[in-house]
UniProtKB/Swiss-Prot annotation:
Record's keyword annotation contains Cytoplasm: yes
Known EC number: 2.1.3.6
The protein's name in its UniProt record: Putrescine carbamoyltransferase
Domain of life (superkingdom): Bacteria
Length: 343
C-alpha cells in the first residue's frame, strides 16, 4: 500500500524519529563522499502552483544525489485543474503512470488532498495554505543536530515568535509529536486557531509535551532552547497593508539581541527563510553564532532525501547487491529495519 506525506498527524513519533535518523545517516554518508544510489532510475514529478527556492532545489538535488531524476511541472506548462484543462484527479492519475512519486506545492490544502486521493504513487506535500510538513522534518532534524548538552528533543522548549503562519502551525505539530514544549509568542488575532491548537494539545497529551500561546515575553522566552520566527509580510496573504502589519508586530515581536537574551544562554535561532532582515529578525541575530538558519536551510535537503527514500522503499526491491554495496552498514541496517505503522 502506498503512503503519502501530507500531514505529520498521519505519522507516529517512532516514524518521525526514523526519518530523523535516516536523514542524518544519508547526510553523513554524502558528506563523506558516498552517494548511495537508492533511487536509481526513479523519477519525481514536481507540481508547483506557488514559487519556491528551497523546496524545489532540495527535491531536485536529493533525487540527483540518490541516482534519480526530478521533473519540474509548472501550471502554465501542463494541464493542471483549470476550467479549460484536465481535472486535478485525472492529472494525478496520468502522472502516476509516468513517474514514481509526486510532490506538489499548491495554494490550498484541498488541492493536495485531491491529488493524493487520485494518485496511485506516493504524494508529498510541498506546502499548502494549511501546513508545510517537509519543513517540519527539516526543522526537527536541525533541532536534533543542535541539542543542548545532555538534552533529548523531549527535554527541549521551542518558541515561535510572531504570526500563526503555516510554518508556525507545522512547528507545533512536529514539536508536540516529539514531546517538546511548544510556545507561540504572538499577538491576539494572530495566534493559532483553537481547532488547530487542539491537534497540538492532543499530540502533547500522548507524547508528554506541552503547548502554550502567550503574549507575555518573559513567560515565552524563559529557558527557551530554540527561538524560531517567520516573515510578517509578503509571503502570506493579508488584507492589511505593510505599515499596518508592521504596527502589529514591531518592535515587540522582533527577534533581536534583547529578546534572545531572555532565552537560555545556549539557545539557537531558527528561521524557515527567506528572511526580511530588520523586520522579524535583526542582522545581529540572523548572522550570529547562535543562528542555525543556514543549517536549517541545508536540512531541507536532508529531509527530502529521507522522505523520498522512505516513501519509495516499499516499491523498490533492493537487491542484496545494492545493500551490500553501501559503504556504511548503518544505512543498510536502517533500510532493513524500516518503521511503518501501517503494516
Amino acid at each position: 500500500m502506498k503512503r503519502d506525506f501530507i500531514d505529520t498527524k498521519d505519522y507516529t513519533q517512532a516514524e518521525i524519529q526514523y526519518l530523523i535518523d535516516l536523514g542524518l545517516q544519508i547526510k553523513k554518508d554524502i558528506k563523506a563522499g558516498d552517494y548511495p544510489q537508492l533511487l536509481s532510475n526513479r523519477t519525481l514529478g514536481m507540481l508547483f502552483e506557488e514559487s519556491s527556492t528551497r523546496t524545489r532545489v532540495s527535491f531536485e538535488t536529493a533525487m540527483t544525489q540518490l541516482g534519480g531524476h526530478a521533473q519540474y511541472l509548472a501550471p502554465g506548462q501542463i494541464h493542471l485543474g483549470s476550467a479549460e484543462s484536465e481535472s486535478l484527479g485525472d492529472t494525478a492519475i496520468v502522472l502516476s503512470r509516468l513517474v514514481d512519486i509526486l510532490m506538489a506545492r499548491v495554494a490550498t490544502h484541498d488541492t493536495i488532498e485531491t491529488i493524493a486521493n487520485a494518485a496511485t504513487v506516493p504524494v508529498l506535500n510541498g506546502m499548502t495554505d494549511y501546513n508545510h510538513p517537509t519543513q517540519e522534518i527539516g526543522d526537527i532534524i536541525t533541532m536534533a543536530e543542535h541539542l543542548p548538552a545532555g538534552k533529548k528533543l523531549s527535554d527541549c522548549k521551542v518558541v515561535f515568535v510572531g504570526d500563526a503562519t503555516q510554518v508556525c502551525v507545522s512547528l507545533m505539530f512536529v514539536a508536540t509529536k516529539m514531546g517538546m514544549q511548544f510556545v507561540q509568542y504572538g499577538p491576539k488575532g494572530y495566534q493559532i486557531k483553537p481547532e488547530t491548537l487542539a491537534i497540538g494539545q492532543k499530540n502533547a497529551e500522548v507524547s508528554g509535551g506541552s503547548v502554550l500561546i502567550t503574549e507575555d515575553t518573559d513567560q515565552a522566552m524563559r529557558d527557551a532552547d530554540f527561538v524560531y520566527t517567520d516573515v510578517w509580510y509578503g509571503l502570506y496573504e493579508s488584507p492589511l497593508s505593510y505599515d499596518e502589519r508592521m504596527a502589529i508586530f514591531y518592535p515587540k515581536y522582533q527577534v533581536n539581541d534583547e529578546l534572545m537574551a531572555k532565552a537560555a544562554k545556549h539557545a539557537k535561532f531558527m528561521h524557515c527563510l527567506p528572511a526580511n532582515r530588520g523586520e522579524e529578525v535583526t542582522d545581529s541575530v540572523l548572522d550570529s553564532d547562535a543562528s542555525v538558519a543556514w543549517d536549517e536551510a541545508e536540512n531541507r535537503l536532508t529531509a527530502m532525501r529521507a522522505l523520498l527514500v522512505y516513501l519509495m522503499a516499499p516499491i523498490i526491491d533492493y537487491s542484496d547487491d545494492t545493500l551490500n554495496n553501501l559503504k556504511d552498514p548503518a544505512l543498510k541496517d536502517l533500510l532493513n529495519n524500516r518503521i511503518d505503522s501501517t503494516k
